[in-house]
Amino acid sequence: MSDMLPLATYSLNVEPYSPTPALNFKIPVTIRITMAAIDPEPFDDDKKPSTLRIIKRNPELTRGEYYNQDNNDGLEEDESESEQEADVPKRSVKSKKGKAVEQSESEDSEDENEIDDEFEECVLLTLSPKGQYQQALDITIAPEEDVQFVVTGSYTISLTGNYVKHPFDNSSDSDEDEEDYYSDEESSNGEEEEEEEEEDDEELSSGDDDLDDLVDASDIESRLDELVKKDEKKKNNKKDSKRKHEEDEEESAKPAEKKQTTKKDKKAEKVKDSEESKPKPKTKLLEGGIIIEDRVTGKGPHAKKGTRVGMRYVGKLKNGKVFDKNTKGKPFVFKLGQGEVIKGWDIGVAGMAVGGERRIVIPAPYAYGKQALPGIPANSELTFDVKLVSMK
């Protein structure tokens, strides 16, 4: 849909129980409907929700009507000719009258079925001032489509969108380009065929001249053998040159492939070496089962009881769900060891330096215990990835 070019604004008011065509004029233009909204002023006192339906003529049926019309025209011509040739004798009036009544009833039922099959009906949406006021849509209607809208309920529904230009409208240019391409290709193929035919004619004519100069039958046979060998030699030379060319291409491609593979191998080795050279995080088990894992070692003095520290952190549950974080703005500041935070933080942050990064896994008794908080169930083990950014 993004390829369509908007030309102008489209709007249509569909009043209750009044079928309204999507296009009121015969200009061949495509429309794209993107929004439906309800008018809060009711048409009656029932104040029922309004349902928008789209009614579309069945394209298969219209195509069938076209063929049926041609067949009916042919039948009418045959009937007129048969009437001119001879009058049909009258038969039993009673039996004919009964058959006519049955036939008319069956035709009426068939007409009703055809009317039902002629149109396709589909519910698009239902809106009400008490609930939903509007609904986004994305419906494109081509100019050749016979489409109507009808509303059942107590409120008018307004449709809005754009008149758009379809990308396939400029197909004539591409057709001309294709014709030019094929005409050029045919002409080039024709020239190549003519050149090959001229070469063959020259070879045949030269061979004929040589044979005319020979009188003896044995000379002719020997000359024919020479021509055949000469032709085979040419073919073999062509094959050899082609094979040599392919071998040269393969050899030239091999160094490039080797270079690519060596570069990839070197990169993989560097990544592997860098990963292996990285020191593994040090894990320690502290009081109450608290686990700390130093990811980055900071510089300067270590945090201790009474030190005011500024922290960045991301708090996660055991299933990996993030329940709290401080990654930008003002850092979270508290005094270490004074009970301003959960006990797991007072124990887990101690010993860090500025710039240090650490993972702290805190069992439930050293976090919030049996207390349930928003986003944190009771008896939850918490994991914090923390970074010490300031210390006083």
Swiss-Prot record:
A UniProt-annotated Pfam family: NPL
Catalytic activity: [protein]-peptidylproline (omega=180) = [protein]-peptidylproline (omega=0)
Location within or outside the cell: Nucleus
EC code(s) of this entry: 5.2.1.8
Disordered: region residues: 58-116, 161-284
Positions of post-translational Phosphoserine modification: S80, S82
Compositional bias (Acidic residues): 73-86, 104-116, 172-219
Listed Basic and acidic residues bias regions: 220-234, 252-279
Entry keyword set: Chaperone, Isomerase, Nucleus, Phosphoprotein, Rotamase
GO biological process: epigenetic regulation of gene expression; maintenance of rDNA; nucleosome assembly
Annotated function: PPIase that acts as a histone chaperone. Histone proline isomerase that increases the rate of cis-trans isomerization at 'Pro-17' (H3P16), 'Pro-31' (H3P30) and 'Pro-39 (H3P38) on the histone H3 N-terminal tail. H3P16 and H3P30 are the major proline targets with little activity shown against H3P38. H3P38 isomerization influences SET2-mediated H3K36 methylation thereby regulating gene expression.
Protein name, entry field: FK506-binding protein 4
Organism of derivation: Saccharomyces cerevisiae (strain ATCC 204508 / S288c)
